[in-house]
Amino acid sequence: LFYLCHELRHAQQYLHPQQFEQAVVESLPYVILYNGTCFKLCGKEWKGCVLPGSEEYFSDVYLSLPYELDANAYAYRTVKFLLGESEALDKLYSMWLPKKRISAEEYRKLFEQVDVATEG
């Protein structure tokens, strides 16, 4: 149920971006995976690149993406509302929190790198 709610939240983010904080909206065109593989939505096409860095760093980057933090928090709140308090739910939610949060400034720099790497 957690993952269903998480993915439904992503659908809501893309369909109704005006309902979300600016940080979520600005991050939506970007996908940054655990291994540094990145994608940017350019019109209707996804363009890819790979940025250098460790898997540990990019795991935190992925987990700190504003749209991921929002989707995980939404899934947690929704499941908790529907099924009540649960140690298993708390543990699952904790698993999807970054060890080190990435700052908005660092995201701006990363998104700029992806922009440059996916041009042309």
Positions of the model-derived regions?
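Metalloprotease/metallohydrolase-associated module, dominated by Zn2+-dependent proteases
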Residues: 25-119
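Catalytic Zn2+-binding segment of zinc metalloproteases
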Residues: 7-26
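Short pre-active-site segment immediately N-terminal to the catalytic Zn-binding motif
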Residues: 1-4
